[in-house]
Amino acid sequence: MDHILLLFLMLLVSYVQCYEAGLNLENGVKLKVYLSPKITLFPGYVSNKSYYDIEFPKGHIAVKSFNDEVVDEAGDPVSLLETYIHHWTVTRYYQRNGVKDLIIAGNSGLCNHGRSQFFGMGSETRKTSTYVPDPYGIEVGDPSKVPVGYEEKWMFNIHAIDTRGAVDAMGCNECRCNLYNVTQDKDVQPLKPYYVGGLYCCYDGTQCKVKNAFKSVKRNVYFKYTVKWVDWSDSIVPVKVFIFDVTDTWQHTGIHNCLFEYDVEKSTTGVATNTRRSSVSFPTAGDVIYGFAQQYSGGIGAALYGEDGRVLCASKAIYGKGKDIGDEAGYIVGMTTCYPKPGSAKIVKDETVTLESYYSSKKMHTGVLGLFYFLVAESS
């Protein structure tokens, strides 16, 4: 009887500890919901800020999923029709206590500069699965990997555009320079004459054109993000995070110079689909166990191919069809994901892997994105 009472008390203490920490437990998987710092917006306003030392699970863990959405001060979801999420990223870094300098502890590649996030999406956030299947997990918090005297921390970069009252909401989302009345980039350097839209025109603090009679009302929004994880154990198979950018200019040089964005010209030949491709030599051997593409409006999908032309992973854009939150017409509200059967999507070390990104070319699109995020379990 005593041992039953002792077991009950242990379970009760465990439950109370989880409750006090804001944790939920489901089959050993821990879950916690966090809020980003406040993001203040006005109609047409752009916020593109980085937030350091955000809340994130502590300890040596395996992340199983990372989901989020934009909410207002009441905690209610915010529509893409009002606040467009151009992109968000979550990046790991190491920092010494009391020192501003930091070391970016990014993913496994492929770009030499940038694209170092562990997690990231855009408007497709709400309907894109991020769950890492068993027995795999994204390993973080390993004390043996943290430099002596440093602490592992995490940062958010959130690029949000308030399109309430916008003259051309889609044009604002594509960062058309004429709508932002911008001729210089954020570093006060003049834009090149042929640059008509993209990140250089919708940087933090810029404002897209709104209707003259529209009342400017301030709004505070937040990113509500939910992390699921398990404590690390030998039964978990670690996976590496890779991000393939279709603008990668690699040409057997070993240098992955990613341009980050590109334009899709309106077709003059009757071909309705624009295809952009890039090939790289893959640095390791392993199995693709999960993946999805990231694109902007106009995107159709993307696919990752092996050297022999086999499909390693493919992802299609999911468009909204109405006005409800999560179903906004004309917006990519989700991307399909791939979960290859174990062993069916193997990559050999130094194999040439090709990414193809597909966009509609019925009209012009500026500053588009062509990323493929995928997880690889390395071969032993």
Predicted regions and their residues:
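Cleavable N-terminal signal peptides of Sec/SRP-targeted secreted and luminal proteins
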Residues: D2-C18
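Beta-strand-centric surfaces of beta-sandwich/beta-rich domains
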Residues: C18-S380
